[in-house]
Amino acid sequence: MRWKRGQSSGNTIDARGSRMPGGGRVAVPGGLGLVGVLVFLAVQLLGGGSGYAVPSAFDDGTQAPGGGAIPADQDPERDLRDFSEYVFDSAQRSWTRTFGGYRDAKLYLYRGAVSTGCGNASSAVGPFYCPADQRVYLDLSFFGDMEQQLGAPGDFAWAYVIAHEVGHHVQNLRGTNDDVRRLQREDPGQANPLSVRLELQADCYAGVWAHSVFDQLDDGDVAEAIRASEAVGDDRLQRRATGEVRPDSFTHGSSAQRAKWFRTGQASGEPADCDTFSVDDV
C-alpha cells in the first residue's frame, strides 16, 4: 500500500513505554477482536467478540494510564507504528464521509498487557475493540505473529486487521453491537451464530474501506488481506490448536466466510452490502 506520513489526527495513544499496574495479570476482555483469544483456543474461548467476559479478580475495568510513548529516534517499530496510525486515520476519514453519525475512536498502542474499559487483557488476545471506551487496542508485535505463526504477511494484511477493528466501532455507533448482545441474552443458543455474523460484518466493513483506497494499492495488496482473513478463520485456528474443527463453537466465521465478506465489501464499497444479519446463509 502506498502511503506517506502526514499530520496526525491526534487519535492515537501510544502507551508502549508504560507497564500495566498489577504485573499484567490477564482476564479475557469483553471486547470485539479479530481472532479471539488465541491462547485459550484449546478450551474454545475463541470469542473475543462473544460478549461474555470471563470473571476474574483482576477484571475490574480500570484504565491504564496514558503516555509512555517511545521517542521516534529510539523506536524500532516506528514505521509500523506510523503505518498503523495512517491506516486507522484513513479508515476513520472514510467512515466520516460515509456515515453521518460517525464519531472518532481512539487507537491505543500497548505492549504485553493492558487494562481497558472492557477488562484486562494481554497481547495474546490479538487486536480488539472495546465498546465501553471506544478504543482499538493493538500490540504491534501481532504483526510478526501474523507473518510467522499465521502465514499472513504484508502491510495490507495488517491494514485489514486495523480496518476490521474500526468496523467494530462503526457497529457500536450504529447500535448493532447492542442489538446482538440483546439477542444473545434472549436466546443464548444463538450466541455463537450471532457473534459470527457480527464479525463477518466487520470483515465486510474492512473491505468497504479497502475499496475507498483502491488507488493507493499495489499489486497483491488485496490478496494479502484475503490471505489474512482466511488465516484467522475459526476452522483454521481450531485445526492448528486442537487438530479438529467444531463449527458449533465458531464465533468469528470460517476462513471461507471471512474472505467472502471481505471481498463483498471490497468489491462494492457499499456498507449496505454488509448486512450479514438479513441473509440466511453467511
Q: What function would you assign to each model-found segment?
A:
Residues 233-282:
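Pan-zinc metallopeptidase signature
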Residues 76-78, 82-102, 107, 193, ...:
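Short helix/loop segments within enzyme catalytic domains
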Residues 53-57, 113-139:
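Catalytic zinc-binding patch centered on the HExxH motif and its immediate surroundings
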Residues 166-181, 213-214:
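Catalytic Zn2+-binding segment of zinc metalloproteases
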Residues 1-70:
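Long amphipathic alpha-helical segments used for membrane anchoring, targeting, substrate engagement
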Residues 83, 102-104, 123-125, 131-135, ...:
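Extracytoplasmic
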Residues 142-160, 190-196:
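Short pre-active-site segment immediately N-terminal to the catalytic Zn-binding motif
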Residues 95, 138, 156, 160-173, ...:
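Active-site recognition of the HExxH zinc-binding catalytic motif
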